[in-house]
């Protein structure tokens, strides 16, 4: 099964190095408005009604990206709800209105590179959420990063700060690491 069951997610909270510095997206609006704006295309996945992951729109067309360990088959994708705007409207406040569509077609997936590219049905409902691009450049040590996510299925959160390095911000610490294959991942804090 791809993704993680809710019980498994509750037990896997030790994947954060140091203090968990994720905050509701709205908590960063005053200090990092540009990073908050870049979180709009990020969505929560509900796979087969029980597994949770994060995905994001990539490019202006009907294209979504997630990890292969989240969605690895067309059958899973057809049973995946894609939730946009699943986040708090204010810092630690009430929930925003969520927009839901279903996964539609799997365009490409790769176990070793741990990605899945797919489309959604009713694309017009989510077109206004914008999109992210892809950066083909190699990551380098010290590059700043921001991490928008639905960790553990939570309303959208954003990690910008880190207690693991001198800059106080999230950054690339290992530019080339072994993921599911040799040199297929990047280590970050």
Where would I find each of the regions flagged by the language model?
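Short loop/turn motifs that recur once per blade in beta-propeller domains
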Residues: 188-189
């Amino acid at each position: 099964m791809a993704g993680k069951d809710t019980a498994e997610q509750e037990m896997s909270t030790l994947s954060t190095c140091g203090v968990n510095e994720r905050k509701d997206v709205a908590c960063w609006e005053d200090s990092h408005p540009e990073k908050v704006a870049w979180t709009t295309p990020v969505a929560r996945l509900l796979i087969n009604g029980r597994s949770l992951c994060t995905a994001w729109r990539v490019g202006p067309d009907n294209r979504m990206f997630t990890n292969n360990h989240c969605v690895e088959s067309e059958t899973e994708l057809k049973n995946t709800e894609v939730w946009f705007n699943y986040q708090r409207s204010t810092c630690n406040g009430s929930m925003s209105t969520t927009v839901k569509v279903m996964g539609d077609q799997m365009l490409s997936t790769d176990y070793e590179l741990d990605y899945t590219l797919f489309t959604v049905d009713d694309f017009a409902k989510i077109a206004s959420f914008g999109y992210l691009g892809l950066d083909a450049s190699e990551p380098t040590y010290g590059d700043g990063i921001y991490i928008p996510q639905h960790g553990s299925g939570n309303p959208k959160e954003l990690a910008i700060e880190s207690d693991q390095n001198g800059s106080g911000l999230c950054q690339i610490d290992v530019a080339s690491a072994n993921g599911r294959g040799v040199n297929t991942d990047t280590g970050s804090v």
